[in-house]
Structure formats: C-alpha cells, structure tokens
A protein has these predicted regions:
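Short, flexible coil/linker elements and helix-boundary hinge sites characteristic
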Residues: 5, 9-10, 56-57, 140, ...
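Extracytoplasmic/lumenal domain signature
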Residues: 70-96, 101, 108-149, 154-250, ...
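Intrinsically disordered, low-complexity Ser/Thr/Pro-rich tracts
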Residues: 2-3, 8-12, 61-70, 112-114, ...
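Terminal targeting segments of Actinobacterial cell-envelope proteins
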Residues: 1-32
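C-terminal region of N-terminal signal peptides and the immediate post-cleavage residues
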Residues: 47-69
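Low-complexity, Ser/Thr/Pro/Gly-rich disordered linker/stalk regions
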Residues: 31-34, 38, 64
C-alpha cells in the first residue's frame, strides 16, 4: 500500500475547491438557522416550565431531545389478537430470511447456503433497459441507474413457498419480485426521488416494510394490501429542530421490540414507537417519535469545522446500546434501554473520532467489540493517527483502540480508506477498499494476512456463507473465494460477469441463490447453471 496519496490533477483540485466553497456557504446558512432556532428555543424555555426532557447522562449533547410524533394515525380499532402474516425475518433467529442490511442487530448475518458452485445469471430485472431517474446533489442534476452502495435486497420466504425479493432502486421506486423468476409480484412503490435500497422488512412477522427515499420521507409500508401502501411517514426536515447536510435516508432501520431505530442524513438518530397491531384483518401502526439524538457535538464541530454530520450507515445494536457513525467520523454509543421500556432516560456511553468520513456500518462481535471502517479524504493528523480500519472497546473510554490498520492506497477521486462494512467470520475480518480489492485481517491482532486486488472502487460489503466469501467489483464481475482456511490467501472458486455496470451493492445469498444489483441499471438473480445432459452411449455394432 502507498504511504502517500496519489497526486491530484488540477481539474480534481478545482472540483474540490468548488465543493469546499459550497460547504462553506452551507455552513454559514446553517449557522444562521441555528441562531434563529436557539432564539426560538430560548423563548419557549422561558414560557414553558420544565422545557424539553434532556438526557440523564452528563456526556449527552445538549440538543438531544424527546420529540413528538409529526403525524398521528388512527389507533387500531380492535386488540392485536390476529396471528401475523407468515413473513419470516432473520433478525429473529427462529425464523428465516434476510430482513435488513446484514441480517441482524449487530450487522453480522450474511444469509443461508448453499452458495452456487457453478453460477449463471438466471434472470435480469427489468428484462431490457434500466431502472433510472434524474436526481440532484451538490454536483447538480444527473441520471442515476440501478442500485448503489446501500442497495442490498431483503429476502422474504413465505409459507406458501414464494421467495420474495424487496429492494429500492435509483428509478425512485421500491420493487417486489419473485426471487426465482424476477417477475413482479406487487406493484412498485413510487417515491419522489432515489430509493437507495437499504430498507427493512418487519422481523416479527407483521406485513410491514420500512423504507426511506431521497424525497425526505421515511415510510412505514403495509404489505398486506393489493398494492404496497404507506401507512405513515416521517420527514427529515420537519421532525427535528434543524438538520445538517442532507435529507436522505441511506441506512436500513432496526426493529427492536416495538421500536424502530434509524439514522438520517439530516444528522439525527431516531427512535420511533411503532404501536403495531391489526384492525379489520389488516395491519396497523400508530407511530410516535419518542427520541431524536444529534450525530454531532460541539467538540466535533470544533475539530472538523464542517456541517457534514450525516448518518449514512445502518445503526447497530447490542444489549440496550445503539451504535452509529457520521460523515465527520464521530462514532457514538447510546444506552437506550429505558427508552425501549417506555421510559425517558438515555445517555451517551461511547464517543470516538476517526478523523474522517465514516459511512460503513459499525459491526459488533459476540464480546461487544466494535469494528469500524473509515474513509480517507482529509489526510489529517487524526486519520493518520488512528488508521482507517479499527477494533474498538466501547467500555474503555480513555483509549478504546484495540488495534488499527492504515488503508492509504488511493482510488476514486484520490481518496483512500473504506466505504464497505467489514464482515466477521470466525477469527477473520474481511473488507473491501476504495482503491479496489479485498483485505483479510486477523480479528484478534489486526494483522493484515492477505490482500487481493480487484477493479475499484469496491464499495460492496463482503458476505461470507458456508466458508465462501463473495465480493463484486467495478467492472460488473462477482467473485467467490474459498475462505475455509483461516489466515491463508483464499483461492478463487469462480468469477461471473454479471453486467457492465459497477457492483456497488452488497449481494444477498439464500439457499443456492444470489441476488445483486449494479449501477448498470438492473437487478440480477443468480443460481446454479443447468447441467448438460449426458450423451447416450453409442451402442456396440
């Protein structure tokens, strides 16, 4: 790996200067908005005794607040006594399916084998053309196609044998397909902008789907109607005092009990009481936003001097504590046990700064250690000090780093580091790099055991099922490696040209099937290729 970044060409430098100018303008706007918001809050605090309930922990940022629900749907008209629809979820280990990104609360479940050993593309959706739409970002309006970095599908087995595939795409829609045929089984759910794809199906059997869009709205969707139906939504602009950076919803939510946990690109973490039930034979919800927590604090604003605090990863959870990171590199842990019991107390239990944009989800192992992957764009002192891949002990506040590894080799836009979420497998950790390639790292020591170069950027998060490691590259090729021997550079089992578009999305693996979308515009179903029939033996004359 290179110790220094590659030279930056003048055009790229000019784009960076323009981006920094836009960020500075946004910072000035946000500063003015914050002053106005603080003035309003001050008036309210004087007028209303008690004010807003604050966190019980002294380390909690002062702007963390309990929030009311933005809308109040009607309550169920009858008690919840009906048996939920037979949709199986993987967060619950007693049932089957991949219901959220990386399948469980700690983001460590990758699917169910067997993995195809002689794979072939069985179907493409759509059969021609692509799932494309126009959308605007800081670079202007452009056409987006297919599924991107956050686009792992849900896999939902039904009791009648149907295998359902659910995913969002850059055509602004959520799609619901027969996983074996690629044919739609329900109409699309149309949103007002990109549907990034990291959505969640209810893990407790309720026919509900939780999905965000770049149109500002995070939706709770009923799946027991003829068409997917939005029962409730929360708007990233109107549900918090003020936001930072963006209004998208990149992360896949978690459902813990009757509570939904989600982070937004508006830089806030949410806890929503769902109040799930049934009325008239149909699923109902009566959601209430019970907690919002900012992803930043004053120390981060001083250290990072930017308003880029968005949460672009999927939150993780273990034993009452939720973990997430933001695009300024702040990793936080919050104790929300009392909130999940209907109380009002919560506190920050962990704070760690990586020094740079951290979009990958925090992964938690069985001992409670955290594995964090960070990008390398700023090349500042902090990111040099702590590296881009690290194992953290969240119960050790003064020096939580167990080990760290620099990943400085540069790729797209002159950036190094990691966009993908690491995969844990026995004593190893696997992660793909922005420069292009796979790393195999010893979980205990942090020692780099091997690396495999691939055409980058490789943003898809690796998956490991039945000792097979699967990763996509940016030429549209899917690779499978035999990782049965820990610590040894794995031999490639197969590679499959899926499409010409970059594979940014994480594959979903389930019982001899692999599904993956590409930036070329389509979703693909992959399974064992048909074996040729043996030719009849020639008869002796």
């Amino acid at each position: 790996m290179n110790d220094l970044p590659s030279p930056v060409d003048p055009e790229l430098a000019e784009r960076r200067r323009a981006r920094e100018l836009r960020r500075a303008q946004r910072r000035r706007q946000v500063f003015i908005r914050r002053l106005i918001a603080l003035a309003i809050l001050g008036v309210i605090a004087i007028a209303i005794a008690g004010g807003i309930a604050l966190s019980s922990g002294g380390s909690s940022p002062e702007s963390a607040t309990k929030q009311p629900s933005p809308t109040t749907p009607a309550k169920p008209t009858e008690p919840t006594k009906l048996k939920p629809e037979a949709i199986l979820g993987a967060i619950n280990p007693k049932v089957a399916g991949i219901t959220t990104f990386r399948g469980n609360l700690t983001r460590t479940y990758y699917g169910h084998g067997p993995v195809p050993r002689h794979p072939a593309v069985k179907w493409r959706y759509p059969t021609s053309g692509g799932m494309c739409a126009q959308s605007a970002d800081e670079h202007g309006v452009s056409t987006w196609c297919g599924t991107g970095w956050t686009g792992q599908p849900n896999v939902i087995p039904h009791k009648n044998g149907l295998l359902e595939l659910r995913f969002g795409a850059y055509d602004d829609n959520y799609h619901f397909l027969n996983g074996r045929t690629g044919k739609p089984i329900k109409p699309e759910l149309v949103t007002g902008d990109l549907a990034k794809g990291s959505a969640t199906s209810d893990p407790d059997g309720y026919p509900l789907y939780y999905a965000g869009s770049r149109d500002n709205n995070f939706r709770v969707i009923a799946m027991d109607r003829a068409s997917p139906t939005t029962l409730w939504s929360m708007n990233s602009e109107t549900t918090v005092p003020y936001g930072h950076w963006n209004n998208d919803w990149d992360g896949a939510a978690l459902v813990v009990g009757d509570y939904l946990l989600e982070g937004g690109e508006n830089s806030w973490f949410y806890v929503v009481k769902l109040n799930r039930g049934y009325a008239g034979g149909r699923v109902t919800v009566n959601p209430e936003i019970v907690l919002t927590v900012p992803s930043w604090d004053d120390q981060l604003a001083a250290d990072f001097s930017t308003d880029a605090f968005s949460i672009e990863n999927s939150v993780s959870y273990r034993k009452g504590r939720v973990y997430f990171a933001n695009s300024a590199g702040l990793v936080q842990g919050w104790d929300i046990r009392d909130i999940l019991r209907g109380g009002s107390n919560y506190r920050r239990t962990f704070r760690f700064w990586t020094g740079d944009d951290t979009d990958a989800s925090v992964v938690i192992d069985d001992k409670g250690f955290l594995y964090v992957a960070s990008e390398l764009e700023k090349y500042d002192e902090r990111s040099t000090q702590v590296g881009q891949l690290m194992k953290l002990n969240p119960f050790r506040k003064k020096n939580p780093i167990v080990w760290s590894l620099p990943v400085r080799q540069t790729g797209s836009e002159g950036s190094g580091g990691l966009w993908s979420t690491p995969a844990l497998d026995r004593g190893m950790l696997y992660v793909s790099t922005n420069a292009g390639g796979l790393l195999g790292v010893d979980r205990k020591t942090g020692k780099l055991r091997w690396k495999i170069p691939l055409p980058g950027p490789t943003w898809a998060s690796p998956v490991v099922v039945d000792n097979v490691l699967i990763e996509g590259d940016c030429t549209g090729v899917l690779h499978a490696y035999d990782v049965s021997r820990e610590g040894v550079r794995p031999p490639q089992l197969w590679s499959l040209k899926v499409d010409s578009g970059c594979i940014e999305s994480t594959p979903a693996v389930w019982r001899n099937w692999i599904w993956v979308g590409t930036r070329g515009g389509a979703m693909f179903g992959i399974s064992e290729r048909a074996r040729p029939k043996r030719a009849a033996r020639a008869k002796n004359a």
